[in-house]
Regions:
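Detector for methionine-enriched segments
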Residues: 1, 21, 37-39, 76, ...
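Betabetaalpha-Me/HNH-type nuclease active-site subdomain
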Residues: 45-154, 159-163
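Alpha-helical interaction segments
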Residues: 41-43, 112, 171
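C-terminal, well-folded lobe of enzymatic/effector domains
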Residues: 2-13, 17-23, 28-29, 162-211
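Residues that form generic nucleotide/phosphate-binding pockets
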Residues: 39-43, 75-79, 128, 184, ...
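N-terminal module-boundary/linker segments of secreted carbohydrate-active enzymes
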Residues: 2, 22-70, 198-202, 209-210
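A near-ubiquitous, low-amplitude feature marking generic local secondary-structure context
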Residues: 13, 35, 134-138, 168
Length: 211
């Protein structure tokens, strides 16, 4: 199969992606503080709740609801990235911009330029467990782990650096993308009634202007 390579530069891709994000799903660089920021449940600090395992949120990714045989991860890469070539029905060669670093990412760096991709839980599973998910029924934990609102394709290096940290311990390396990140995290926390520490809440508010 002939691989379709992008004809635009990384800079052009970044500018185009930023414009699209401002107009559609990821208003990076043009957002204001989410209303969810005022609705956060705060606790003095994050305490470790014993018993966390990845399998408490399901054995891997859930199945796609629209493409039989594919996974939720496959769906997220398909919708959040630009498909360059249909090398595989579930996992095409795709490219995009990491919403944490602003750098080009690729689902297959050997075939299309960009850093390797991982799919990140914006509100990490381990952190969610500590902040209340330990008490959820399995069905709710499965839904949380596979909720598209909590999933984002990012550079592997950013995801590894973040690990299970919340904002008082980690923020995106690109400072212009931090408001978007904490807004997303606040929305998820409010939706799922997850608490954040006072330190996390303070850092989150600091990243976004009022309005």
């Amino acid at each position: 199969m002939r691989i379709i390579r992008p004809v635009f530069s990384a800079t052009g891709l970044l500018i185009t992606a930023t414009i699209i994000m401002c107009l559609t799903l990821l208003p990076i660089g043009c957002e204001r503080r989410s209303p969810s920021m005022t609705m956060l449940t705060q606790v003095p600090q994050r305490r470790t709740v014993v018993g966390y395992k990845r399998t408490e949120f399901g054995a891997g990714w859930g199945s796609s609801t629209t493409r039989p045989g594919c996974s939720v991860r496959d769906d997220m890469l398909q919708t959040q990235l630009t498909v360059l070539a249909e090398s595989d029905r579930c996992r095409p060669i795709a490219q995009g911009i990491c919403p944490y670093s602003g750098r080009v990412i690729s689902s297959d760096p050997a075939m299309a330029a960009g850093e390797p991709i991982e799919l990140d839980h914006i509100f990490p599973l381990s952190a969610a467990w500590d902040m209340g998910a330990y008490a959820w029924p399995m069905a709710k934990r499965l839904a949380f782990a596979n909720d598209p609102a909590n999933l984002v394709a990012v550079a592997k290096a950013e995801n590894q650096a973040k690990s299970d940290s919340l904002p008082s311990e980690w923020l995106p390396s690109d400072s212009s993308r931090r408001c978007w990140y904490v807004n997303q995290l606040a929305d998820i926390a409010v939706t799922y009634e997850l608490a954040v520490s006072a330190a996390d809440a303070a850092v989150m508010r600091h990243q976004c202007p009022m309005g």
